[in-house]
């Protein structure tokens, strides 16, 4: 088999990036990935190696979205760039520019370097945040033609993803720019590769530990991280994907009580602690005034946001797995991690 081309994946310590690197290596690509801190290199190699990757075809280099250093070397010799890294705040920043500016400037740094090195195509992992946070007529599904209006009252994270993606499309319109394709995932679930859990995976972990004791009827669409990786590769290699954006969702939104029910049905005794009772919407809204974590959830109450995922399926032959399988795989992965941690003690 001829050696396939080299792909740069930004933000190699992240959840989506880790699964994307696994798939690229399994498919025969050479992969280079960036980390903010090169001290993470051994951890990343160990994590990917445990998951079965041939890590000898992986280079790890230091580059940070907030500075110019390292991007030129990172992109050199790569046919494709997968820009996955994005600042995700552990808490809402005091000033929204703390997250908006690095997201936008970081995306432009990657595109400038890709342009300078004649990269063939840059695939950007954006988010449903850039599509679905402005109102639509009730019941109409969100699709790739929709954009969040940053003048609406949206969180700094939502604004950052929208502003960064807009900047990418503006850049792509310039003569001589590489081809650009964008994937916009909804809530990304699936098996964690290490104990550094993404926000969505933390929801499943909390449910397995009996938290919150009463479940808000918050709803969100779900996609499996392995299916996101698959779609990112299709968006990279398929000629039709140039200049296109793709909403990545496995189907219509589910509620926290729906997810809890899947866990109980599929896991049996391992789901003994999963909460059974619901918290009425009015109580969530009242509590949100005092509990910041509930503020994000209170925005997910009421009518679920319908989504239309047909573009990726029909244009690129994408086949996302059923949501119940993703929820189960997430829980199984968490249980394996916790038993591995216990064995190490």
Language-model region placement:
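Glycine/proline-rich active-site loop of Rossmann-fold NAD(P)-dependent oxidoreductases
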Residues: 175-178, 190-203, 235-246, 270
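Conserved Rossmann-fold NAD(P)-dependent oxidoreductase catalytic core, especially the SDR/UDP-sugar
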Residues: 83, 87, 93-157
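A conserved pocket-lining segment of Rossmann-fold NAD(P)-dependent short-chain dehydrogenase/reductase
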Residues: 92-93, 149-154, 195, 202-223, ...
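Mid/C-terminal beta-alpha module of Rossmann-like enzyme folds, strongest
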Residues: 231-294, 323-345
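Conserved C-terminal active-site "lid" loop/helix of NAD(P)H-dependent oxidoreductases
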Residues: 286-317
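Active-site Tyr-X1-5-Lys
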Residues: 152-180
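NAD(P)H-binding glycine-rich loop region in Rossmannoid oxidoreductase-like domains
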Residues: 39, 49-105
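N-terminal Rossmann NAD(P)H-binding glycine-rich loop of SDR-like oxidoreductase domains
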Residues: 5-29, 34
